Amino acid sequence: MPVGTVGSVKAVHMSELREEVGAEIILGNTYHLYLRPGTDVLRAAGGLQKFNGWGGPILTDSGGFQVFSLTDTRKMTEEGVTFRSHIDGSKHLFTPERVMDIERLIGGDIMMAFDECPPGTADHRYARESLDRTMGWLERCFRRFRSTEPLYGYEQALFPIVQGVVYPELRREAAERVIEYDADGYAIGGLSVGESKDDMRTMIEVVNEVLPKDRPRYLMGVGTPQDILDAIERGVDMMDCIMPTRDGRNARLYTWKGTMNMRNAKWKDDFSPLDPYGTSSVDRDYTKAYVRHLFAADELLALQIASIHNLAFYLDLVRTARKHILQGNFSSWKSSVYDDLDRRL
């Protein structure tokens, strides 16, 4: 899922997301949208889908990760989290009930439960306390969700989030507890936050041994092309990450043959297509030399081209993975492309 934190996927028009990238769902963030433009504006607009012109499915993160990253300006209790806005310093309180109400107002097709996202280096004692707090909040989230109705004429789903840091017994317990809610789908959170790649892969395996195979399984905030294939191999169905657009704006382009730094002088007189294997028009319309020139000149068009390319590549990656799953040869295909994905060109 392309990430549209504040209601927009950076440097990309909604029409380009649909036609060039081929995205079917995007992500918005409750914390940021609550602070700006605010729920009054979104309610008056008829929900985020109408406000931003996307018009398609949206998943809203609960904002928990963002709130807990404000280590110097937030205070946590069993009731919820008090924090100060990064915009103007104003004071706010997020409780599970309040977050459910905000996500109803935003209008995401898929809503995420309010959780605590501890760092990947948290010790076992803190991980235990954090998990218990998250599970208590989850009960309150579902109670509020099931006692309220959608506002914009379509159904909304609520996904619980499995936490537990890198402790297998906590992850397994969390997975067993969340499936009691018989939700429409389940998320795996708290990974790619400082733990090792091996720990991340192990936690995905532990959780997916428990989560039902007939419901979507969403790995939050991951990751590189290799991470995505590793996750798919372990049973993950959905992912989001800011890497395609963030790295694109920093001149890093992902391709089937490896990654390109478009600021490198080696592309100065390379007039071949940006990516002969790419699926978007920018890959055919522009040359490596031209895109390198745009970055050197700090032209805004560089950010747009790179973001479209990377997002289109990521969507091509997962669609190709799906094709090989259906053909029954995913493992051999993954082995044939895996190393190239991390090569520096």
Language model regions located:
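Generic secondary-structure signature for well-ordered alpha-helical cores
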Residues: 108, 139, 143-146, 209-212, ...
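C-terminal extensions of enzymes
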Residues: 115-121, 275-345
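Glycine- and acidic
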Residues: 120-124, 128, 185-191, 300-303
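C-terminal helical cap(s) of enzyme catalytic domains, especially alpha/beta-barrels
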Residues: 38-45, 248-262, 315-318
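Non-catalytic, usually N-terminal nucleic-acid engagement modules in DNA/RNA processing proteins
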Residues: 1-151, 265-268
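Conserved, mostly hydrophobic/aromatic
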Residues: 26, 61, 103, 160, ...
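Glycine-rich phosphate/ribose-binding loops and adjacent secondary-structure elements
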Residues: 132-135, 144, 148, 153-274
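A non-catalytic, amphipathic alpha-helix used as a structural packing/dimerization or gating element
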Residues: 98, 102, 129, 133-140, ...
